[in-house]
Amino acid sequence: MTQHQDAIAPHGGSLINRVASETQKQDLLAKGDSLPRVQLDKRATSDLEMIAIGGFSPLSGFMGQADYEQVVHHMHLDNGLPWSIPVTLSVDEGVADSLNVGDLVRLDDPTGAFVGVLELTEKYTYDKTQEAVQVYKTDEMKHPGVKVVFEQGAVNLAGPVWLLERQAHPQFPSYQIDPAASRQLFRERGWNTIVGFQTRNPIHRAHEYIQKCALETVDGLFLHPLVGATKSDDIPADVRMRCYEIMMEHYFPEDRVILAINPAAMRYAGPREAIFHALVRKNYGCTHFIVGRDHAGVGDYYGTYDAQHIFDTLDAQALGITPMKFEHAFYCKKTLSMATTKTSPSGPEDRVHLSGTKVREMLRRGELPPPEFSRPEVASELAAAMKA
């Protein structure tokens, strides 16, 4: 393989681009006031952007009923391609009744800004309980993903989209790297194997450990923190990004790591979302994807390693990206280093278990996470942000 070839093809073979050209954009903006409109929530706004930039390839729009049913029940698109999360645009029945198949629908973000259009090809109802149970493994409203499903509209709108305006990420301009751009960066660096890492939490020592373990076996590491909609108690995106900047400056080899933002929203769908996250990183050009403990989980809804086991149920060749599975890492007091049960000689009493949840709890109590939890510079940044 030469430096000028992509290490891996996008999911489905082609990278989707539904970002309107300047000519298209001006034409659509001129029509905007005359179009029927739908207001998107934060998640749908993120989904629109991810579809348009190719992050959700091969999707070119919000799912029709055939794809939706296959994804919910069988984890693949209607054409058989693996896909684990429904990507839909849901509206109330009244809104759906006011629209006709064939309409060009104006899409506004939560502030009312005109951000895209939908070429409406289909309207269909769906079973919310079935979606919740199949995708999230529960129908409890306290699950944040399930809550979204039950509170959204009863009708899904389907069809191709065009994106006119990106979500604003003014604090991260240099990290807004789309799939086409990340692939170009990987080619320029001559990387043939790239491992992606997904997170919604500030980096702690366990994350750093598994990232570096993975980096020992590949050409490059793609750090891809999520900056779309998350739970209200998650650490804000700007704080998480500052922590990663600190790590890049002091603790990672800069020529082996690329940091970029992921504009997607969290679903908290555990095992299914682990597959989804892997496919998204495949579109960004990653050949491998790190799957750790309780990936994309919330509460106690999923088993510790369910998100790893689900990869064994899919055709590896059809999936096309290789999961790198890691056990739960901890700080070993006996060896004074990070380890897992595979490498540590210590018993439970000498293991300091780390998690984003524990870090958040310490910060809320006004405690500075110790060096066993976080690098000192990161701990100071988190503490300062919590006070502010």
From Swiss-Prot:
Assigned keywords, A-Z: ATP-binding, Nucleotide-binding, Nucleotidyltransferase, Transferase
Keyword ATP-binding carried by entry: yes
Enzyme class at the top of the EC tree: transferase
Transmembrane segments: none
Domain of life: Bacteria
EC number assigned by the record: 2.7.7.4
The keyword Repressor is assigned to this record: no
UniProt catalytic activity: sulfate + ATP + H(+) = adenosine 5'-phosphosulfate + diphosphate
Pathway entry: Sulfur metabolism; hydrogen sulfide biosynthesis; sulfite from sulfate: step 1/3
Single Gene Ontology BP annotation: hydrogen sulfide biosynthetic process
MF (Gene Ontology): ATP binding; sulfate adenylyltransferase (ATP) activity
Coiled coil: none
Cross-referenced Pfam families: ATP-sulfurylase (PF01747), PUA_2 (PF14306)
Record HAMAP family: Sulf_adenylyltr (MF_00066)
Sequence similarity: Belongs to the sulfate adenylyltransferase family.
NCBIfam families assigned to the protein according to its UniProt record, in alphabetical order: PRK04149.1, sopT
Designated name of the protein: Sulfate adenylyltransferase
Source species: Acaryochloris marina (strain MBIC 11017)
Lineage: Bacteria, Bacillati, Cyanobacteriota, Cyanophyceae, Acaryochloridales
Gene: sat
